């Protein structure tokens, strides 16, 4: 986080942080602005995804991990991102994230999910899955 200040933890890494997946992250998934250079950090396997605005800046939370402030996407934004990048991470991961979000969140915010789906332009993709879990 200190070496890459514009990066935001996303996808599988964010799902794992929020407890929304059974997947074990083997890399740290980072969102960077379009056309940013790929950072190199020794000993840390990174997987970079390029985001454009407004998707990059939407839904960011700041959490403290080991005394360091880390930018990470909210659970709702992460679920929408999983559907956007379903061809890279797998549709099964996206569906599992949505189902787990609904089951483990005391008050699921489906309006926020719909907002982030619209920002990511995946409303049509997510709609049948949202209807199935409601």
Language model: regions and residue ranges:
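Nucleic-acid-binding surface
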Residues: 1-134
């Amino acid at each position: 986080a200190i070496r890459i200040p514009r990066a935001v933890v996303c996808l599988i890494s964010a799902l794992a942080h929020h407890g929304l997946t059974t997947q074990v992250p083997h890399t740290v998934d980072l969102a960077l602005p379009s056309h940013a250079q790929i950072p190199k950090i020794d000993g840390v396997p990174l997987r970079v995804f390029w985001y454009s605005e407004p998707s990059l800046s939407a839904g960011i939370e700041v959490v403290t991990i080991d005394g360091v402030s880390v930018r990470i996407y909210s659970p709702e934004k992460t679920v929408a991102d999983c559907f956007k990048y379903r061809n890279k991470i797998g549709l099964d991961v996206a569906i599992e994230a949505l189902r787990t979000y609904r089951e483990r969140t005391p008050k699921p915010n489906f309006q926020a999910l719909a907002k982030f789906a619209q920002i990511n332009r995946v409303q049509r993709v997510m709609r049948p899955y949202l209807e199935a879990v409601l």
